[in-house]
Amino acid sequence: MDRKKKHIQEPLVSKEELENKDNILIVKDLKKYFPIKKSIVSGKTSYVKAVDGVSFTIKRGTTMGLVGESGCGKSTTGRTLLRLQEKTSGEVYINGQEIFSLSKEELRKIRPTIQIVFQDPFSSLSPRLPVGEIIGEGVREHGIVPPEEFDDYITRIMEACGLQEYHKDRYPHEFSGGQRQRICIARALALNPDFIVCDEPVSALDVSIQAQIINLLRNLQKEFDLTYLFISHDLSVVEHISDTVGVMYLGNMVEYSETEKIFSHPLHPYTKALFSAIPIPDPTIRRERIV
């Protein structure tokens, strides 16, 4: 009598990779497809392959830049690996845990360790809450500190992000764009995370304010031993802040390497074309554009 053996899918990540404590994030063959329409003739559904088989690893305490043109799947990658939306397939390990295999309760327990800073600081902040409540809401919900230490803790976090204690009672509309982004960073930092996805955190800001926010992120990384996935279309910013860089095109990771190596010697034709569009601050120098 033939017995049917239950098929057990082998993990995509090796045991050695999982046991390496330096690997805070491991992404293997991540896919995220969005259904768009169903054919009347065949009855089959078509899909947009926003993320199509992306793999990379981020070392603890480092910053990985993720670049590419609009619509290439950068932000979808960041949101999916945090499980803000469900995957189509693939595996994502954060601190050795496969995040898509966790139950809702297990996921809730690790949420404080994985945070995100969104692109638009105004739309990502509740207009109905004062800044102190915005930053402290998650702290109170997850019991990060005892109740008697709550106020002092929020004050310390705000000051670390360049905000003042008297800002607690103000509302988001009373702040500039740069200050609002500091509030978003403070909200993420207050939960004592290990890993933060920075989803184009400076693209909506003036150049001078961009530099301040980038320097703030770097200082916080050193002080709190943070790891970043820095998503941006601004290549000069990515070159400044990142240790490694991944280049995405049409949902695929076409190139991934150390920052210095990829900027000095890009290999993929799309990477070369992308870098050829970086403006040179000297008007006497002409660069060959690759279209």
Name each model-derived stretch.
Residues 201, 205, 209-284:
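P-loop NTP-binding/switch modules centered on Walker-like glycine-rich loops
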Residues 190-194:
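A short, proline-enriched helix->beta-strand linker immediately N-terminal to the Walker B motif
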Residues 1-23, 35-42, 47, 258-291:
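Short catalytic/signature loops enriched in Gly
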Residues 90-98, 110:
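Conserved ABC transporter NBD signature motif
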Residues 82:
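Helix-to-loop junction immediately C-terminal to a conserved catalytic motif
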